[in-house]
Amino acid sequence: MELNRECLLHFSGLIPLLTIPWLGTTWLIFTVLVALHRFRERVWQLYCQREGLAKYLAIGMVSAYFTEVLAIIDNLDKPPAERALLHPNPLTDLYLALAYYLPFVLYWGLAAKRYNYSWREVFLIGGATGILMEQSGAVFLSMNPFAWLYVLIVYGSYKALPVLAAEGCLKKKKRRELGAWKKLALGLLVEFTAFISAGALLWLFRVIA
């Protein structure tokens, strides 16, 4: 049964590739997540050779920036006012992306290091809360379940990817065990705190710019 679920996951990673003409490129980050899962044993060996927060942050920010670049590609053919980005100008958007994504990558990294979160749990919690945050709540208010699923997959993938890369090392650490409800509550706190921090950093980055 576990093998069948794993095969299903790996095959599902092909879906974003096959739907690019209709759904765009942004959710290709899910394909990257699935590919990482497929070769996770090798990735864990490389990661554990020199683990640390700096390496985790590097992987997390590469994941986040890859997602943002894909989002820019999907929005280039739209008028600037209609682009679902941090800023309609691609270069400015990439500048602001550092402020937005860093708190989510950092806080989830600290939470996963201390508590027994799996990449799947980060995927679900981070993806579900992303539905509320995307476009300042406009996606959630659209009441479109397909849009919800799309956002869940995109947000969940970029947040879970560094956790999956580090999971081989994390499992060897003495992390505090939490039950499902406590994990959910703490995960929501991580998301809320990261969202507030991202908002503050975005304001600061815009002032500096």
Which positions does each model-derived feature cover?
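Aromatic-rich, lipid-facing transmembrane alpha helices and their immediate juxtamembrane interface loops
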Residues: 1-209
